[in-house]
Swiss-Prot record:
Pfam families recorded: NQRA_2nd, NQRA_N, NQRA_SLBB
Protein family membership: Belongs to the NqrA family.
Reaction(s) the record says it catalyses: a ubiquinone + n Na(+)(in) + NADH + H(+) = a ubiquinol + n Na(+)(out) + NAD(+)
Keywords: Ion transport, NAD, Sodium, Sodium transport, Translocase, Transport, Ubiquinone
Protein name from the UniProt record: Na(+)-translocating NADH-quinone reductase subunit A
Organism ancestry: Bacteria, Pseudomonadati, Pseudomonadota, Gammaproteobacteria, Enterobacterales
EC number: 7.2.1.1
InterPro entries: NqrA, NQRA_2nd, NqrA_C_domain, NQRA_N
Subunit structure: Composed of six subunits; NqrA, NqrB, NqrC, NqrD, NqrE and NqrF.
Enzyme class: translocase
Amino acid sequence: MIKIKKGLDLPIAGAPAQVIEDGPTIRHVALLGEEYVGMRPSMLVKEGEHVKKGQILFEDKKNPGVVFTSPACGQVVAINRGEQRILQSIVIEITGDEQVNFDRYDRAQFTQLSREQVEKNLIDSGLWTALRTRPYSRSPAPGSSPKAIFVTAMDTQPLAANSQVIIATDKEAFVDGLNVLTKLTEGKVHVCHSAGSLPNVGNNAQITYNQFSGPHPAGLAGTHIHFIEPVSATKTVWHLGYQDVIAIGKLFTTGTLYTDRVIALAGPQVEKPRLIRTCLGADLLELTQGQLKQGENRIISGSVLCGTQSDEVHHYLGRFHTLVSVLREGREKELFGWIMPGIDKFSITRTTIGHFLKNKRFAFSTTMNGGERSMVPIGNYERVMPLDIMATHLLRDLLAGDTDSAQALGCLELDEEDLALCTYVCPGKYEYGPVLREVLTKIEQEG
């Protein structure tokens, strides 16, 4: 077992009951283009066109052969684009249940599957895009091979679902997915999990279980990769979530695209925080209708630390998200708030009474309590960074755009979510995720 000592479990109210319920009927789903780093779409459908579930919507120009498929059957009602015609979302109104069929196999055939067969089925179905590389967090190029594959079978983000509850409902599909993934690498398939039992994978020596414990970010792929098989400019691994492993298992045994998602609907503004079974790309306005407390709320696809804010074209469940968080919009200003005792405020430093109330859960809002200011190194970053990285020096170099120094300090091991806690505890109110992405893009372009 690998025990993480540094980090932070945010004491936020509204944790979900770990019981799965069926969610409301969803009428619209969407595929969000901005979730895929560096992707440039070549559209294969138009607004008003009817599509089947699993039908190709577009192909990535920068990664030829990688296609993106429809998560539901219905009509394409909107293709939203932003600045420089960046694809924001493709919205589908669900009608009917037609779907594309893919290759299916008996479990007894899994050991005879070739890498080419597995890759073809994943690409054709669109499940290839569930895989992400580290470094750079891109969809892998067809024909490439990683040193290892990491399956994130735990989640330590604030308000997250217990992954073992969800895996227990589809044990066979999870094991099938793991066995299929072994065909994509000559290395190990590392299943990273928290305390508790997971399904037995039999005698497949390629699959290894790695137990992690401790505060967030103990459940992030970046943490697992750092402690088991660190990456570099010349070493690449892939990672994916446990629900995508289940979808891969069902694809190969049924020949159909499985797009169900079990998510946690949680947060201080949710009336009944719980686990909900819904679908990939679900409309968050439909999903949360009648579920929230009165007032102005912010709906977030993903964690409160690094999720995507719901807005006019982004109010859909993200491809890599298993959590919908809801916070109150904090628009009020507090006079001399810095001098108050702060019994209802949490701080990682000893500046509020809330810091000492270890069992209290706080109704966080979106209030930032101040604006952007100088970066002050007072040890906060080191408290929440469990990786063997000099956090303050790295963050300083990221802000300065020093790619050489940032690379030497380990930025290639990181993704935006790995710096989310640094953003939260930063007294200067800097957003380190977007800055990291700019530096990674520059490093990749420079070769």
